[in-house]
Curated annotation (Swiss-Prot):
Keywords: Cytoplasm, Ribonucleoprotein, Ribosomal protein. It comes from the Eukaryota. Pfam families: Ribosomal_S8 (PF00410). This is Small ribosomal subunit protein uS8. One of its GO terms (molecular function) is structural constituent of ribosome. Belongs to the universal ribosomal protein uS8 family. GO terms for biological process: translation. InterPro entries: Ribosomal_uS8, Ribosomal_uS8_CS, Ribosomal_uS8_sf. It is found in: Cytoplasm. It comes from Brassica napus.
Length: 130
């Protein structure tokens, strides 16, 4: 299998395990972007605890699933989004206004679209989950 995007592979394996009713999933290889994305998901309660396992290669992440994740995905290419354009992206990607999050990478770090709007920063779209 050819790895196009490590983040895409991680989110797809989580989504597939969630659909199958699994309680946990192992993601490998890991990266800092995946860990930050998982922190945003955990902050909003879409996943449980996760643990980084160092295997002296690229590392693994074991994620506890709690059954709240309906869909997650990566937006490729990573489009530039200004603060005023965030509303349009949420309307395009999410099922409703109060449901789900878009994850952005900004100059202030990786965060969801609501936090980016509060801090008044734009960035690049990484992905979404709901």
């Amino acid at each position: 299998m050819v790895r196009i995007s490590v983040l895409n592979d991680a989110l797809k394996s989580m989504f597939n395990a969630e659909k199958r009713g699994k309680r946990q999933v192992m993601i490998r290889p890991s990266s800092k972007v995946i860990i930050k994305f998982l922190i945003v998901m955990q902050k909003h309660g879409y996943i449980g605890e996760f643990e980084y396992v160092d295997d002296h290669r690229s590392g693994k992440i074991v994620v506890e699933l709690n059954g709240r994740l309906n869909k997650c995905g990566v937006i490729s290419p990573r489009f530039d989004v200004g603060v005023k354009e965030i509303e349009g992206w949420t309307a395009r990607l999410l099922p409703s206004r109060q449901f789900g999050y878009i994850v952005l990478t900004t100059s202030a770090g990786i965060m969801d679209h609501e936090e980016a709007r509060r801090k008044n920063v734009g960035g690049k779209v990484l992905g979404f989950f709901y």
